[in-house]
Amino acid sequence: MVPSFLSLSFSSLGLWASGLILVLGFLKLIHLLLRRQTLAKAMDKFPGPPTHWLFGHALEIQETGSLDKVVSWAHQFPYAHPLWFGQFIGFLNIYEPDYAKAVYSRGDPKAPDVYDFFLQWIGRGLLVLEGPKWLQHRKLLTPGFHYDVLKPYVAVFTESTRIMLDKWEEKAREGKSFDIFCDVGHMALNTLMKCTFGRGDTGLGHRDSSYYLAVSDLTLLMQQRLVSFQYHNDFIYWLTPHGRRFLRACQVAHDHTDQVIRERKAALQDEKVRKKIQNRRHLDFLDILLGARDEDDIKLSDADLRAEVDTFMFEGHDTTTSGISWFLYCMALYPEHQHRCREEVREILGDQDFFQWDDLGKMTYLTMCIKESFRLYPPVPQVYRQLSKPVTFVDGRSLPAGSLISMHIYALHRNSAVWPDPEVFDSLRFSTENASKRHPFAFMPFSAGPRNCIGQQFAMSEMKVVTAMCLLRFEFSLDPSRLPIKMPQLVLRSKNGFHLHLKPLGPGSGK
């Protein structure tokens, strides 16, 4: 039997705990209300669409067709308008080149309200770092994306793509349309495994396969968390099955990366192994990071190495998958452009069996079509920043430091004040002459300014090799009954996949 004084003590503790929770909850509410007041006051000069009393604009921007709704708002509210995710997170949503230049030519940090969700997986890598630490990492990583490093990757892109195309050859024999998205995703992730760790389909052990599945899982789970407001609170999220699944996948990914780093560092202590690695046809991303030193001869810590490897895997997987899938959809939708691209790459390939690095620079028309597909379907439709200092825009309106900015790339790319007939697929927009006349911040598929995508040359090189090989092997056409439905998440996906008809071309079309 529990003594009465202990019962009273437990009761008192319970009351104290309940009281403390109520006080903390009240203080949190006060903090949120003050933050809303600050954000709302900062944006009071910017009219915008009406908000829901509880959800702000969240319900509208999660609906099918929400991207085009934002485009319609852009017509109604030139330059920018407030965009509220619930009642406490408000961004100034911008979609005009001069407004974009005012913010993205600087180097303000990513908005923590969005990007802090990524920390559990990718840590503090280049995507979320700021200040001197970001600058140090940017300088250390830049040599890893130099042309001389990228050149040997053409063979890696070719190898992974050929595996995918052989699968498509079998599927195409059935004479029915099929969804290409998962196969493209598998190919893109397989390519990254080879370029990051020197692994691939020919050498995936159990540990590598588990990592491969974990990265796929983490990407999907992160997408789902971003659009599910009940998951935005960390404490609540980690208690849910969704959150626990995310943590398990994180552990698998981190264990794999840590072990590969340990093994590679140990191997590099052996001079023979080190020379063998240095003489390979290409250095993988991990080798480059391990050899990176700044001007003070300081190298990346193990935690930094893991963060940058995980960031590279995250940023380079879904974006590439999205870009390739939407491009092939555009080719199916516009067969005249598909035909012209195919003829160009056939002429470039000639009697060769494979594309060489120098061939990529000759793919003029294919590159213009890739860029036009990026304009209409940017792989990352929206990015976010937090102002580190005040900004004054071209029309005289301003925002204070601490304000949140949403750069709506999709709406920018369909802004009729910038792009005549924005819904029309016109590859000639990206001819040298036309591109030179355009505002430098009118086209931002890889963001812009000092914090632009460090891997854009890697991505464009992969896009060219993959799409050229696809067009040489198959003729793509639409399935009118299953057209893609745009679904904006962290990357631009299709709600129902990308169902295309593929017609194998004759021998010699793709070597």
From Swiss-Prot:
The keyword Iron applies. It catalyses: an organic molecule + reduced [NADPH--hemoprotein reductase] + O2 = an alcohol + oxidized [NADPH--hemoprotein reductase] + H2O + H(+). GO terms for cellular component: endoplasmic reticulum membrane. Signal peptide: none annotated. Changing residue 345 to I: In allele CYP4B1*6. Induction: P450 can be induced to high levels in liver and other tissues by various foreign compounds, including drugs, pesticides, and carcinogens. Heme binds at residues 315, 453. One of its GO terms (molecular function) is heme binding. GO terms for biological process: biphenyl metabolic process; fatty acid metabolic process. Belongs to the cytochrome P450 family. This is Cytochrome P450 4B1. The gene is CYP4B1.
